[in-house]
Amino acid sequence: MIRTPAAMLLAAFVAVGLVAGCGPEAGPSGSVDRSFTASGPVRLELSNGSGNSRVSVGAPGEVKVHAEFRVRAWPWDDPDRTLKDLLSNPPISQDGDLIRIGATGWHRTEFEADYTVTVPPDTQMRGTSGSGNLDVDGIAGPANFTAGSGNIRANAIQNDVHAMVGSGNVTLTDSKGRVGAMTGSGEVVVRGAKGDVRANTGSGEIRIERAEGNVEASAGSGNIEIRDATADLRVRSSSGEINIDGNPGPSNFWDIRASSGDVTLHAPANASFRFYGHTGSGDINVSGPSAKDTSSTNRHDYQARIGDGKARVEIETSSGNISIH
């Protein structure tokens, strides 16, 4: 059985979600705005115990924060006093080029917060959410995001981006650097990445489209779909189907393995690779690009040269069929 690091994420983050969301009744609410100026690149640290956060690009040298607080009415506390303290002294501060947003420790459980933040284009970010969604658009990065329970969406990050979620989905679009995405339980979607991509989920589907760099993808339980692949591929699935659409470059290697599930490769007529296929229990069917120099000792093993045979493609599944169209 193939084990993935994402399989342990859900349990690791459960406590965060429980602490952030259990027990009290709804209390009073209020909002506050803060503005800061910066003479150089900004570092943003955002920590939200419960609530949604959105970060987008605004004017150079200027940071604006709008916070909406909803205080939890714990039986032993005074929610009106808590809200008054929040509005007069919100967890928003500046220290040189560092902007900090959000409470830490036990204070994170006293309220929910929705943050709307605009930052200069040259901003790097570290964002953490206990329970809630995190949405980031257009910053320079690098960017690192973590969520216990909720979705992470990041668009057009100009450098490396890494996102990790216990229970929820990750969607990363048009990133210019390297991409890392991991979920314990949820879907991973990566589109238009310029750099290498690493995607991992314990339980959920992975979809990668138009990645220009090398791709590594692994799923404990769920399907994997990769479209418009050209560079190196390394794909692993314990339980689920694998569907690949693309054309490996002349010197690239595609290594695709499944424990239980079918593997399907869609390649164009001008594809050029050496193909090696093995299935423990299932059939191998090659009906797409013209295959030459074929070799098959039985219905579970197959070798062939597709086109000029410049790249190398290896596909193996313990229980399932292999198809090339």
Predicted regions and their residues:
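Bacterial N-terminal signal peptides
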Residues: 8-19
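Extended ligand-binding clefts on enzyme/binding-domain cores
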Residues: 260
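Pocket-lining segment of extracytoplasmic ligand-binding domains
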Residues: 222, 240
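Bacterial N-terminal signal peptides that target proteins for export
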Residues: 1-9
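Short amphipathic, basic-aromatic surface patches that mediate peripheral association
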Residues: 263
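Transition segment at domain starts
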Residues: 245-247
